[in-house]
Amino acid sequence: NIFIHDGARPCVTDNIINACMRDVMQYKACVAAVPVKDTIKVVDTDGIAVNTPDRSTLWQIQTPQVFEYGLIMEAYDRLYADNDKSGITDDAMVSERYMHTKVKMTLSEYTNIKATTPEDILVTQIFLSQNTKVSM
């Protein structure tokens, strides 16, 4: 198995990693994720809401994203051979598109945030300073 993790997520915990290891053994592909708490709107090019998806079906994807080694390697081989790589935003999408993989959502933690904006970095610093079970 291979774990793909985003270095901008320093608050990943042992519990998240262990849950992903458990799920990849059963499902061959899994991603750390949490249920969406906010209402999400689909908008048009003018910023006008055109649809409100059912929140109960939406998950916020994190890392690690974990795959059987051969599965993700074959998926990436197919990606590199394809002329149309548009719309790929994460490793799970590569596996879904090129291997038709059913990716398991592994329940993660809301503290496993991606620190990409100044606000994210402040929140991450708070989580890391709390002396919680955050792994580095």
Residue ranges and their predicted role:
Residues 26, 46, 100-102:
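A generic structural signal for alpha->beta connector loops
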Residues 1-43, 62:
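Conserved beta-loop-beta/alpha segment of the NTase-like Rossmann-fold superfamily
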Residues 33-34, 53, 109:
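Residues at the C-termini of beta-strands that transition into short coil/loop
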Residues 1-2, 52-56, 105:
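Short, flexible turn/loop "capping" segments at secondary-structure junctions
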Residues 25, 41-45, 77-80, 129:
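A generic structural signal for secondary-structure junctions
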Residues 42-67:
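Short, flexible, basic/aromatic active-site loop/helix in glycosyltransferases
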Residues 21-22, 46-52, 122-124:
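Short, hinge-like loop/turn segments at secondary-structure boundaries
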